[in-house]
């Protein structure tokens, strides 16, 4: 028997794939977007940019911006009863409307 893979992108065939017309990098405005401390954001992973990518299990979650570290934002999300801190590049974040 072969050993099961435990890689970062396992079980993400649909989650981290793009439509053929949407291939390539997103527009620059997505890279340069700014967020305020306390603002609510959605975590939507951009599969073509790997830096600052959160774990795929957090895709679709909503969190609160707590601060900034370099280019990345510090986002807190609630996972059950725990509060988890993630460091996410702004290309993987969308503001909540």
From Swiss-Prot:
> What family does the Swiss-Prot or TrEMBL record give for this protein?
Belongs to the eukaryotic ribosomal protein eL21 family.
Keyword Ribosomal protein present in the record's keywords: the answer is yes
What keywords tag this UniProt record?
A: Ribonucleoprotein, Ribosomal protein
According to the record, the residues making up region (Disordered) are: 1-25
GO biological process terms held by the UniProt record = translation
Query: Which protein, by its recorded name, is this?
Result: Large ribosomal subunit protein eL21
Oligomeric and partner information: Part of the 50S ribosomal subunit.
Q: Which organism is it from?
A: Pyrococcus furiosus (strain ATCC 43587 / DSM 3638 / JCM 8422 / Vc1)
Matching PROSITE patterns:
RIBOSOMAL_L21E
Bias class Basic residues marks the residues at 1-24
- Which Gene Ontology terms cover its molecular function? structural constituent of ribosome
Q: Does the keyword Ribonucleoprotein apply?
A: yes
Report the InterPro entries cross-referenced here: Ribosomal_eL21 (IPR001147), Ribosomal_eL21_arc (IPR022856), Ribosomal_eL21_CS (IPR018259), Ribosomal_eL21_sf (IPR036948), Translation_prot_SH3-like_sf (IPR008991)
> One GO CC term of this entry?
ribonucleoprotein complex
């Amino acid at each position: 028997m072969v050993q099961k893979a435990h890689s970062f992108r396992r079980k993400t065939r649909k989650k981290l794939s793009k439509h053929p017309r949407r291939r390539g990098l997103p527009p620059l405005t997505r890279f340069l977007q700014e967020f305020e401390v306390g603002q609510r954001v959605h975590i939507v992973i951009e599969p073509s940019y790997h830096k600052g990518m959160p774990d795929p299990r957090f895709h679709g979650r909503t969190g609160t911006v707590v601060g900034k570290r370099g280019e990345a934002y510090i986002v807190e999300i609630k996972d059950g009863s725990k509060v988890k801190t993630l460091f996410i590049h702004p290309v993987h974040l969308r503001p909540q409307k």
